[in-house]
Amino acid sequence: MIRAALVLLVRIYQRLVSPLLPPACRFYPSCSAYAVTALQRHGALRGSWLTVRRLCRCHPFHAGGVDPVPELTPKR
């Protein structure tokens, strides 16, 4: 439920806010696409943490590049 709400917020940002701004993300996939994938793959808590870490790296002094969402690690 929380995961779906967070994904919805990112989707709203993608549809309403992002088109008004110039492209600025230094990574592939974009930070918002990364957020959706991270939330869907890892859930609300870990997906949010991964998204915050990614957003903190998205600045002019970081090289950027390809930065995929980590795969789920199997539990022992």
Curated annotation (Swiss-Prot):
Keyword Metal-binding applies: no
Keywords from the UniProt entry: Cell inner membrane, Cell membrane, Membrane
UniProt membrane topology term: Peripheral membrane protein
Pfam families: YidD (PF01809)
InterPro entries: Membr_insert_effic_factor_YidD
Disulphide bonds in the chain: none
Keyword field contains Zinc: no
Subcellular location: Cell inner membrane
GO cellular component: plasma membrane
Protein task: Could be involved in insertion of integral membrane proteins into the membrane.
Assigned protein family: Belongs to the UPF0161 family.
Name the UniProt record assigns to this protein: Putative membrane protein insertion efficiency factor
